[in-house]
Amino acid sequence: MGRYSLENYEKYKTIKIRPHPLPSNENHQKNGQFQYVTCSWKELEPTRGVYRLQEIEKALLAASNPVLVLQPDIPLWVKDHPSDCFAAFIRKVGSYIDSEGRLVGVVISTLADSKEEWNAYIDSFEHQNLLADLHNDILIRYLNGRRFGLLVKCNEENWMRCCEAFAKQNLQHVWKGSPVVLHVTDDGCGPHIRREAYRWHASHANSNAGLGYNLALRRLTHPETVSSNGSLPLRFWFVNTGISTIYDDFSLWVKLVKGNIAHEFPLQAATDSWLTGDFVHNEIIQLPVMQPGEYTLSFALFFNNRTHLQLNIGAKEQGGYYEAGTVKVEVTSVDPLLNIWDSYYPEGYYPLEDPKVPE
């Protein structure tokens, strides 16, 4: 460390953790390749008002990153107003599985492209990502102002037409709020499709195209020593080297462990704004009264259902928590770290006021 290294200007002794990044992320949960789960209206409602919706649940459990398609094949009992009947079926399915957390999205498939059918999807799948066909101009105009994702059916013949559809309908930023799902109709993912998939920030494809997010921790900075009932300042630096964001809500947690004693802390990280590239989160945690000694510091990213987000780092993981290092807890009369960031910038250690003019 050189004479003028920024570490020399730290206000307290810190430890910097830099996990080794893995060469590739092989975690395909909520990422990468998807599978269609196609459900037949005729089979799931063979008699009016009699449903076999448990079949959907079985199919979802068997699929990896399922994308739901409600196939509008008309049952024999339907005599009049088939689109209205299908809309009622959509609402029934939505009420049954809207809270299902495993779905990548639900394709908006209809009989007549009617507003009643579209509204059935919008109203019934409130917590799911609705996927509109990129080339269904009328539907996309109707969804304008609402949150929706895209299903892009493309190949090496029509990839330019897909690019034109993105441009004409101003869909370049859809990926920031909802997934762009790629359906490659060729046998494999050709060079044009692969290149454009990166431009469209596609999160999933029906073939292995290396899409989705790839989240890692670049650095975690924490103090060597903290006070019982004091403050723990933490500085996280994450990076998403993938091409899409993470569409399910998740939160950042920290845990301190000493023997059988464990303390968990939820952090206030704005993870909904984490897209691609680098992002930092700085936070000072208020610690409870703790026994003095050395604690293992771990961190985790949990989805709302408490499943953990797998990071692309070479670090020991247990129960979703990645081990980062150790922190020494002492009993002190004052908390020296309570207002530690009030007088200097923690990422650069620069003073928050202009230096005085030399005499």
Residue ranges of model-derived segments:
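Low-complexity, intrinsically disordered regulatory segments enriched in Pro/Ser/Thr and acidic residues
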Residues: 81, 88, 103, 356-359
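Extracellular/luminal regions of secreted and cell-surface proteins that mediate adhesion/ECM remodeling
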Residues: 211-359
